[in-house]
Curated annotation (Swiss-Prot):
Keywords from the UniProt entry: Fatty acid metabolism, Isomerase, Lipid degradation, Lipid metabolism, Lyase, Multifunctional enzyme, NAD, Oxidoreductase
HAMAP family to which the protein is assigned, alphabetical: FadB (MF_01621)
BP GO terms, sorted: fatty acid beta-oxidation
Site location (Important for catalytic activity): 120, 140
Binding site for substrate: 297, 501, 660
Quaternary data: Heterotetramer of two alpha chains (FadB) and two beta chains (FadA).
Annotated region described as Enoyl-CoA hydratase/isomerase, given as residue ranges: 1-190
Protein name, as recorded: Fatty acid oxidation complex subunit alpha
Chain positions recorded as NAD(+) binding sites: 325, 344, 401-403, 408, 430, 454
Organism whose genome encodes this protein: Pseudomonas syringae pv. syringae (strain B728a)
Length: 721
């Protein structure tokens, strides 16, 4: 053994060939944490010091190759001063360069996923052989960063600037054939032939058949583009990528600028330019929020896995209530492999549900995401029925009938009498108390809430609601079924609106106050879209449905009268009374036309101004900053209350619920991370400036205590520091 560590070993194979193997002990994947980087340095030094070594093959002992850097280390690392961060980055890069500069040929055998730093390590080798099943990519832009281990330097010099810009700016994973096509790898072979192919390649390089030094040289030189080619490659790309990414995600454009800046320099100077830019990105609020979001997502998945131990397997599901929602739930279950009965009392509703499932499956077929055979299999897994005849062997029933407590209670009591004693019943409700609905049941321990978001096939979140009498097994089984459906489940405790709607309605409350203060709703939409929301509140209300919003607001006002009840008529009341229900009937805040693709397209409708005139009680001068604060303070404070009330267990779950459920701007990290980014004390002071607007703007006593003690929700420095 030439070298042996906890993450890397180097052993002799044959005829001077050595194998440098990544296999991080105690982990399911390889990643570049401090330990692995340190051992990589020692392993490279050991190879350098051994005169008998004629070539190096790099392999992985895991199913994947190397998944990238250890993101859990970023939080503390990125708090360091810029100069220290740059120095640390260059120190790490020296290890990759030392590996690249070995006086023998190097071949990497990519057996599985190689992402981020994992791919950057591969780029430092002379040759890359890839299993046909493997995937490679540089996804750093998804964290608000760009490659920092030489990716912006080596990749353009290997596959050309245009291809490298596309790979780096998109952050996408690339299949083996695509990687071969652009020259990112030198060969693609069947997985079982990977080791033999790597050995063959290294032997041919050792024998001189392949000139590894000539292969290496372009990576050490300037980028081979003249001034006109550079201008065409970089300026065009910057404009296009800026349009795609938008102003809140600076990393893709900064990556292109870095490649451009470094184009006229050799490797070492180019790496210095990359390091400076990488650190600049690491210090942005967007990067800190997106890294936090990634870590929150990991925590969420870990929590969901924790339920697996007591979850029962759902082999057969059922949905009560067909139509669009029932069809969407049936589609999602069937396409992910769980057969489902779809029951309704009306044949036309069944047909509507089947049409919805068929339309969604057809869409996947058209896009090449599904074969015709798989589509047929999924359609056959949805069995429509008008009776309870086959419900005896159903493991879980999702009730998705109209949002009316009496109707739901009647339907749930009826289905309970037609299923097995251990069958779990789950109500797809957005606002009705699960404990209230459970009063109609003989086995309330088998009952939970399972709140899907519309449209079901697109929205990643499912709220699993624990009622007063819900058993842990019922909760766990519903979480497991939601995961099986490809959703991100969050367990919340019962209260009006649960987590997402309880937080959303104070946001709409801020909007209603603005409109009543004479602020143009079109302007409000533009300001909130600029802030980062996918759509403004008026447009969102039209999409949700004015009638749905009106009903939800009344439920929330009844549940939290101290702060959500408003005796004055609002914009929602005015539109509801005028039967302007939003997209569903072609007019709400906006009017709707059908575009060329048959989708609704919003247009301004002057007639709405007359409808809104009676609910405008004053004309206030309000700045864009005020608009953001009127909207965001109530949302953030209600999220704080949900955490304090134990509706949601952790800050991570609260934030991810808002990102997955209502499109909270990801680059801001969620409501609680947004408070952290401002500073808890600063946020409390900001809220106090708007105290005259009512109870929704009042910080809780506990939040004031956090402010006084200098605490934060995620226990890290503000991203503004």
């Amino acid at each position: 053994m030439i070298y042996e560590g906890k993450a890397i070993t180097v052993k002799a194979l044959e005829s001077g060939i050595v194998e440098l193997n990544f296999d991080l002990k105690g982990e399911s994947v390889n990643k570049f944490n401090r330990l692995t980087l340190n051992e990589f340095r020692q392993a490279v030094d050991a190879v350098k010091a051994d005169a008998s070594v004629k070539g190096v093959i790099v392999t992985s002992g895991k199913d994947s190759f190397i998944v990238g850097a250890d993101i859990t280390e970023f939080v503390d690392n990125f708090k360091l001063p810029e100069a220290e961060l740059v120095a640390g980055n260059l120190e790490a890069n020296r290890i990759f360069s030392d590996f690249e500069d070995l006086n023998v040929p190097t071949v990497v055998a990519i057996n599985g996923i190689a992402l981020g730093g994992g791919l950057e390590m591969c780029l430092a080798a002379d040759y890359r052989v890839m299993a046909s099943s493997a995937r490679i990519g540089l996804p750093e832009v998804k964290l608000g960063l760009y490659p920092g281990f030489g990716g912006t330097v080596r990749l353009p010099r290997i596959i050309g600037a245009d291809n490298a810009i596309e790979w780096i700016a998109s952050g996408k994973e690339n299949a083996a054939e695509d990687a071969l096509k652009v020259g990112a790898v030198d060969a693609v072979v069947a997985p079982e032939k990977l080791q033999a192919a790597a050995l063959d390649l290294i032997q041919r390089a050792i024998s001189g058949e392949f000139d590894y030094k000539a292969k290496r040289q372009p990576k050490l030189d300037k980028l081979k583009l003249n001034a006109i080619e550079q201008m065409m490659a970089f300026e065009t790309a910057k404009g296009f990528v800026a349009g795609q990414a938008g102003p809140n995600y600076p990393a893709p454009v900064e990556a292109i600028k870095t490649i451009q800046k470094a184009a006229n320099f050799g490797r070492d100077k180019a790496l210095e330019i990359e390091a400076a830019g990488f650190v600049k990105m690491a210090k942005t609020p967007a990067a800190q929020s997106l890294i936090g979001l990634f870590l929150n997502d990991q925590e969420l998945k870990k929590k969901a896995r924790g339920y697996d131990k007591i979850a029962k397997d759902v082999k057969q599901a059922a949905v009560l209530g067909a139509g669009i929602m029932g069809g969407g739930i049936a589609y999602q279950s069937a396409v992910k492999g769980t057969p489902i009965l779809m029951k309704d009392i009306r044949e036309e509703a069944i047909q509507l549900g089947l049409n919805e499932a068929s339309k969604l499956l057809g869409g996947r077929l058209e896009k090449g995401r599904l074969t015709a055979a798989k589509m047929a299999e999924a359609l056959n897994a949805i069995r429509p029925t008008l009776s309870y005849g086959d419900f005896g062997n159903v493991d879980l029933v999702v009730e998705a009938v109209v949002e009316n407590p009496k109707v739901k209670q009647a339907v749930l009591a009826e289905v309970e009498a037609n299923v097995g004693e251990n069958t779990i019943l789950a109500s797809n409700t957005s606002t009705i108390s699960i404990s209230l609905l459970a009063q109609a049941l003989k086995r309330p321990e088998n009952f939970v809430g399972m709140h899907f978001f519309n449209p079901v096939h697109m929205m990643p979140l499912v709220e699993v609601i624990r009622g007063e009498k819900s058993s842990e097994e019922a909760v766990a089984t519903t979480v497991a079924y939601a995961k099986k459906m490809g959703k991100n489940p969050i367990v919340v405790n019962d209260c009006p609106g649960f987590l997402v709607n309880r937080v959303l309605f104070p946001y709409f409350g801020g909007f209603a106050r603005l409109v009543s203060a004479g602020v143009d709703f079109v302007r409000i939409d533009k300001v909130m879209e600029k802030f980062g929301w996918p759509m403004g509140p008026a447009y969102l209300m039209d999409v949700v449905g004015i009638d749905t919003g009106h009903h939800g607001r009344d439920v929330m006002a009844e549940g939290f009268p101290d702060r959500m009840k408003d005796d004055r008529r609002s914009a929602i009341d005015a539109l509801y009374d005028a039967k302007r229900l939003g997209q569903k009937n072609g007019k709400g805040f906006y009017a709707y036309e059908t575009d060329k693709k048959g989708k609704p397209k919003k247009v301004n409708d002057p007639a709405v101004l007359d409808v809104l005139k009676p609910i405008v009680y004053e004309q206030r001068e309000v700045s864009d900053e005020d608009i953001v604060n009127w909207m965001m303070i109530p949302l953030c404070l209600e999220t704080v209350r949900c955490l304090e009330d134990g509706i949601v267990e952790t800050a991570a779950e609260a934030d991810m619920g808002l990102i997955y459920g209502i499109g909270f701007p990801p680059f801001r990290g969620g409501a609680l991370r947004y408070i952290d980014s401002i500073g808890v004390a600063e946020f409390v002071a900001l809220a106090d400036q708007y105290a005259e607007l009512g109870a929704l703007y009042q910080p809780t006593a506990k939040l004031r205590e956090m402010a006084a003690n200098g605490q934060s929700f995620f226990g890290q420095a503000s991203s503004e520091e």
